[in-house]
């Protein structure tokens, strides 16, 4: 007996949860949705909760910014409880509360991590960096900006265990001194981006060692390194032919005599050349700098 039209439609109807979870929904649908929405979908039904958990367990990237400005500790721990395949981890939006107790289990079970961002996480300790060092041999990118708990021993552990490191942000890690940075340079010659900004402990010794050992260097941030001088910049120019960007703002002992060599190689420098600075100053003060005849 032939089916009625509405019965045929009913028999061919396919619901979302009927699609293959891992091969279709997780791999090709949920990866395009914001994490906040996915977490909300867990409330729809038990089946949706199970499906979202499959996605979270297989997620390669975790960035709390996708969930809103402040993610609760309970949500963070729940989302990452079973994940063992993370490659990118950012906890900057958890900086108000995250501690070693919250972070270390996640680090310990995700040995494929390549990108880790701990910027501004003031309540962590050196144990967090040691855990990253020991658990993440494939680590390539690490941000520790404004993590003043980073000390020389923890940095040495990182250098010893993460030779594939390509970029490292140590901005305002003021416990670090020349010997620790020199050790890092010797152990991580593939570094392409490094910031030791806002650290008055850094001198020519560290910068010259970085230049000589990390010849693939492309971006170096020395902002506020008050003790760095022209000699270090000349060494940098000599040993780092791939340098693309150099930041030396507030490095009062670095002048155009060393920066000029890099400018001629089209290296991007955050300090204007003297003539340009003079014109800007005149324009600000008297408002007629554009009319000055530079040939006089």
From Swiss-Prot:
GO terms for biological process: bone mineralization; dorsal/ventral pattern formation; G2/M transition of mitotic cell cycle; positive regulation of BMP signaling pathway; protein ubiquitination; SCF-dependent proteasomal ubiquitin-dependent protein catabolic process. Residues 16-63 form the F-box domain. Pathway: Protein modification; protein ubiquitination. Disulfide bonds: none annotated. It is found in: Cytoplasm. LRR repeats lie at residues 138-159, 164-185, 190-211, 216-237, 242-263. One of its GO terms (cellular component) is cytoplasm. The keyword Repeat applies. SUPFAM superfamilies: RNI-like. Keywords: Cytoplasm, Leucine-rich repeat, Repeat, Ubl conjugation pathway. InterPro entries: F-box_dom, Leu-rich_rpt_Cys-con_subtyp, LRR_dom_sf. Substrate recognition component of a SCF (SKP1-CUL1-F-box protein) E3 ubiquitin-protein ligase complex which mediates the ubiquitination and subsequent proteasomal degradation of target proteins. Acts as a positive regulator of the BMP signaling pathway. Required for dorsal/ventral pattern formation. Part of the SCF (SKP1-CUL1-F-box) E3 ubiquitin-protein ligase complex SCF(FBXL15). Belongs to the FBXL15 family. This is F-box/LRR-repeat protein 15. The gene is fbxl15.
């Amino acid at each position: 007996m032939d089916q009625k039209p509405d019965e045929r439609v009913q028999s061919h109807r396919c619901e979302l949860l009927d699609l293959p979870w891992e091969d279709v929904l997780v791999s090709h649908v949920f990866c395009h949705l914001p994490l906040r929405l996915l977490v909300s979908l867990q409330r729809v039904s038990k089946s949706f909760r199970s499906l979202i958990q499959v996605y979270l367990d297989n997620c390669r990237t975790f960035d709390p910014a996708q969930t809103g400005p402040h993610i609760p500790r309970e949500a963070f721990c729940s989302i990452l409880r079973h994940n063992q395949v993370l490659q990118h981890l950012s906890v900057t939006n958890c900086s108000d509360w995250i501690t070693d107790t919250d972070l270390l289990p996640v680090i310990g079970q995700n040995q494929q991590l390549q990108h880790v961002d701990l910027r501004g996480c003031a309540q962590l300790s050196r144990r967090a960096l040691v855990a990253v060092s020991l658990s993440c041999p494939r680590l390539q990118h690490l941000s520790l900006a404004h993590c003043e708990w980073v000390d020389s021993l923890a940095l040495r552990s990182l250098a010893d265990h993460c030779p594939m490191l390509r970029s490292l942000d140590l901005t305002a890690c003021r416990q670090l001194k020349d010997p620790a940075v020199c050790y890092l340079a010797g152990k991580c010659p593939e570094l392409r981006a490094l910031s030791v900004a806002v650290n008055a402990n850094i001198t020519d010794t560290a910068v010259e060692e970085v230049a000589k050992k990390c010849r693939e260097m492309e971006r170096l941030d020395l902002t506020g390194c008050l003790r760095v001088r022209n000699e270090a910049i000349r060494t940098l120019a000599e040993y780092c032919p791939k340098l693309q960007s150099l930041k030396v703002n507030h490095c009062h002992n670095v002048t155009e005599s060393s920066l000029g060599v890099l400018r001629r190689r089209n290296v991007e420098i955050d300090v204007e050349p003297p003539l340009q600075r003079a014109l800007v100053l005149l324009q600000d003060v008297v408002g007629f700098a554009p009319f000055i005849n530079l040939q006089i």
